[in-house]
Amino acid sequence: LGVDRFTRLFRARTGLAPERIMISATHTHSGPVTSSILSWRDDPTVPKADPEYMAAFKAGIIEAGVEAVSTAQPAAVAVTTAHSEGVGGNRLAADGTHDHEVGVMVVRRRADRQPLALQMVYSMHPTVLHEDSRLVSSDFPHYTREVLTAAMPGLQVLYHNGPSGNLSPRYHVKGQTFAEAERLGALLGRQVLEAVRRLGDADFREDLTVDGATCRAELPPRRFGSVAAAEAELREAKETYERLKREGAPHGPVRTAECTVFGAEERVVLAQAEQAGETAAILAEYNPIELQALRIGSTILACWPGECFVEYALQFKQAVPGAFVV
C-alpha cells in the first residue's frame, strides 16, 4: 500500500507529525485481495488486486483519518484490560502459548461524559470463516463491535490485531459459519464490555501527554533452502494431511495439517524464486522495517509490521509493563 506515501499525504492534510500517524492493518480471510505476494503467484485461487477497489480503499484510509482529526473534541481517556477466554488460542497446539489479555482504551467526551470511542488490541487471527467464503466479512470482530456499540450507542470502535502469527480460533470453533463467528465475536465483546463497566470516573484522565516515535530496524532474511528439500517437505505435509482426514481426526489437527500444506506449497515457490535470484529485490523494498511507538499518558502502543508470533509480544510486554503491541 505504501505506508510512507500515506503518511506524507495524511500529514499534508492534517499537519500531524509522521511519528504520530499510525496506519493499522485489519485482517480477514474473507475480503478482497489488497497486495501482491510472491508466494501466491502460482496459486490459481488467489486473484490479482482489483485496481478500482484499491483506489477506493486507499482514498478511504486518508479520508477516515482526516475526518477523525477534523472532528476532534475535548475528551478524557481511561485504560484497562479485559481477560479473554474461549475465543481462540494457539493454532499449532490446543495447549500452546497465547495471550489472554485484551488492551482497552476508552475515550469519553468531557462535556457529557458519554463514550466517544473505544480502542482495543487483541492477539487472534479473525479466521472463523475460511478462504472459501465468497462473502466480504471482517469475521468475528464485526460481532465484537456490535456488542460494544449496542451497549454504547454512537461509539467508534478501533479494533487492532496484536501479534497473532501462531494464533487462531481453530481449536475453539464448531464450524466455519457466520453463526460461529457471531458466537465468538459476541463472547469477546461481552468480555471487553465487562472490563469497561468496571471503570469509574477516577479512571478517566484529561491531562495526558501524547507523543510518538519511529525507528528503522534491519531484519535478517530467511533462506528457503533447495527446491528439492522444499518439495520433499510438501510431499510429507500432504501425506500427513490426507492421513488425518482418513483417520477422522478432529477439526483442529486437520486444519493445522491443511495450513501446513499451504505453507509448504508457498515454500516451494519461494525456494524457486530464491534460486532464480528473484527475492533480493523484493526484500530490499521491505527492509529495513519501520517500528513505531505511540504514548498516551503512561500507556505505550508498540506498533510492529508483519504477522509476528505471540511469544515476541509476551516478551515485550513483560519488559515494558502497561504496553500493548499492535
Tell where the protein language model's regions lie, with residue ranges.
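Non-catalytic substrate/cofactor recognition surfaces at enzyme active-site rims
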Residues: 1-326
